[in-house]
Amino acid sequence: MSRNLKGVLVVLAVVGLASEQRAHADTESKFAELRDKSDRFEGSFAAFLDRFVGECNDPLEASTCKQASAEFRKKVKGKKFYFIIGEDQVSNLSAGSYNPSRNEFTVNLTPFFPAGGYALTQGAPKKTDANGNPVFPFLPIKVKLPPDFSPQRFARTIGNKEVRMQLVFTPQDTWAIAKRGGGKLEGVRAQLEGVVLSLASSGDTLGAYYGR
């Protein structure tokens, strides 16, 4: 190989790496802006859903509970909120396809975020699957494979719950759908503003979804 050609290849490699770093920086800065403009809830994600839904099963406290939930919904509707979903709680990701020419992996995000018996969703569910779970279309997230990761290793990373999630959403209303065998499933209908995935082991950003 000629010295000139080697020089060209080195330049191309550096340009490619710089482009990838810029893409990650853009992803992080765009999400950081959303995050920094969001409200914080003093409590867990599960506690937020519980207060918003306000199922109020205790008959002795039902009236007070429902009033408190109604006031909470009025207070937070239309505001953006930020939460971190730990890797042990992330259950709505699945491995999609791999594009070898771009070294790009598609992670399928189901916009169903369960916690504490309820779930936050993008829109309200219309039906359930054979297992009684609400059905939603995937939201694809394009991920550049991290260094030293094969497609197989990355798929295992998804399956082994080694991915952390940051979430910004705007709560809109409650929803309920009949549950197989009786009863109902309930949750919070929301607009997903942004979702960022990162490796739990290093914190490195993998990719992001933006709703608007």
Give the positions of each predicted feature:
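Bacterial N-terminal signal peptides
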Residues: 9-16
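Sec/Tat signal peptide C-region and signal peptidase I cleavage site
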Residues: 19-25
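Coiled-coil-like amphipathic alpha-helices with heptad-repeat character
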Residues: 1, 16-17
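Mature extracytoplasmic/lumenal regions of exported proteins
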Residues: 85-212
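Bacterial N-terminal signal peptides that target proteins for export
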Residues: 1-9
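N-terminal Sec/ER secretory leader and immediately downstream segment
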Residues: 27-85
